[in-house]
Amino acid sequence: MSVTRRSFLRAGTAVAGAALFPSAGPSAQSPLTAADVVQRIKDRVGIPWRAQTVDNVVAGAPETRVRGIATTMMATLDVIQRAAKAGRNLVITHEPTFFSHQDTTEPFAQDAAYQFKTAFMREHDMVVFRFHDHWHAMRPDGIAFGMARELGWEKNRVADSQREFTFDGVPLSKLADQIRDRLGARTVRVVGDPALPVNRVAASWGYYTFSATNLVMARPEVDLFVVGETREWETVEYVQDMIASGRKKALIVIGHVASEQAGMKYCAEWLKGFVSEVPIEFVAASEPFWTPRG
């Protein structure tokens, strides 16, 4: 078949145009990496990124191609396995992956549990990014926002406070039941008179130091302090002594996982606002405790 000069020139022009203007389809896009996602997070937290922080890639390689993202409160092996099964190879966790706040791994180099966990992550090309300090430091605090929403307490929030709420004399037992049911917490513990009318609640999601707790509980208007976890020989004893001395006070200990879980559920929604290339989902960390029947 003969080729005319005109058709030859037309074909040449098409080839040149394709070279100058490559397809804008997915094949022309650079793969989304874990480092890309982390950079987008840094660009959108709305605060300067701290030089000293636990918010780092703690497992895997930053240049790993991301196939899907899972947010979670704690990157336990169970969470990592479920994320891998769902095809989510970037796990964004609020709490540590390696058993200490700093995610220090050296003490566990020869530990069987650590080795099993890291081997699984390597096998499934997984990356874990810790997102703790800046998620709390944002305004609003991502954990506090998610928890208030999950509990249905947005309307009770005190103006200019992310962690204080007002109620109309709700009995302590009723409020404790509400917290247990709405958070799906199995092991909520309560200190105080079940009939105590609660008008003002102060909350600390996660762990709270006694040096901060006692300043809050000492305020006359605060009836109830809600916390994820605390030391029994500090905050718990202090509240018991306040009650024994005639003060109308109460304490609810939810458990660390249940007390921050909804904040990382919200994190998945937040990420979808600027990461659209891959699926994103929240993977709940299982509550570790159970209570034997009496």
Q: Where in the sequence are the language-model features?
A:
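Hydrophobic structural segments
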Residues: 2-294
